[in-house]
Amino acid sequence: LEKLEKYQKAGEVGNLLKEFDAISVRDANSGSIVEQFTGEEPVYNLDPVLTYDYMNCCDRIPQIEATEKYLILYAYAGRISNEEADWIAEYAKKKNLKVYAIGGIQKCADRFVDCSPFEVLAYFRNAEEVITDTFHGSIFSVITHRPFTTLIRKSVGNSYGNEEKLSDLLNRLVLTE
């Protein structure tokens, strides 16, 4: 909302949102923004990945043979800081795990895995652990029953923040410390 106001787009976005007959959202922050713009409370829906039992009912997830123990780093390129990358590399070394990067090339990764959405789930299923800073990385960890850490960041200036969406997800799933 703050950035829309900064760029003088809040009125335009608000008017466009009011033209919809219905709006649904996945998190409280998005819901608050929609309500501020439209005066209407949106419908809250689960992410589609949580509405289907992919791991037990989908025959498109391949069996991937793991030749080594690994943790998945699921993050877009450029979002893992050097300090975080160093910490992840040291953590993996202590646990005797390789770091497989999915979603983007990472400084600390032993291997970048370029794969289909169904293969992503196969890699998650076989991982020892997951470190992510994404909404879907957290969800994939939950549906594959993998231990995971979600890196949460505040929006500062023009930098990407995931705090609102991820904090809401983890609170709704009762997965906060």
Model-predicted segments: where are they?
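Active-site anion-handling motifs in enzyme catalytic cores
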Residues: 1-177
